[in-house]
Amino acid sequence: MIPSSLFYCANKDTYPPFKNGLYKEEYFLKTFLENNPITKRKYIPALWTNFQIEGWFQSYKENMQSILDDWVLNNPCENGYYVVVQYDDNCLLKLPENTIIYGSCSGSIPIPLIYQDKHNTLENISKINFDDKTILCSFVGNITSNKVLPNVRDLMFNTLASKKNFKLINSGGWNPVVNKNNQDLFINNTLNSKFALAPRGYGRSSFRFFEIFKLGTIPIYIWNDIDWLPFKDEINYNKLCINIHCSQLDDLENILLNIDKETYNNMLNYYTTIKHLFSVEGLYEKIINLES
């Protein structure tokens, strides 16, 4: 462990609202310490997102960098290091040059943007079958973005919001507390949709991509600069979901209308064969296997 509690502070937020348990950085650290696996590269044990969202981080950043540098000097590894990061902007401390970053939104290797839900809130909701879904495609969320152009969510709303087969609801600006009304809007509209939009936001990924599957609906991942879907060595995304660059939004309606019931259900069935990779347990196992 890095000899400073600053690297292990609790996360002050509960976001998304369906989280009940640990964030993936927390789960990975906890499970790593319990199992002490042998890996080629050395794991840098830190809860990056937890301390980087704190208001005090900038004041302590220089001190934390010094502590991290000392830890690296005292824990040499010829093969290099690796970190596991959720934070959109990656690690805000300087890492050794030979570090692999398993990142949810940026880094070296894409990983799922997920969290632990011990209650299985979304999975336990009764699903609606293909024939009874009344909406072709929906979205409930805000128009969050960063400075990477084009702005995916703006473009998505401008292109699709007026089409009768699409139901897009702007829930307002991003807030770490999602009220019950917006939770219900997301759940009910997603359940009743054959497809649901999962555009990148500030980061390259989206929690909703993984949540949509849990509601028995197929997500549409929309990206601009880099496609950040994880584990393509093991997952065939052509069999799993719709994956488009934002320049293809004009074609999306025709793409969806040409997917029949059999193809749709095959996607959901394929999801059941790979969904363990979208869990904190499966993510831990995958990274340890890659590092072994």
Where are these regions (language model features)?
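Nucleotide-sugar donor-binding catalytic core of glycosyltransferases
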Residues: 1-210, 215, 222-245, 259-266, ...
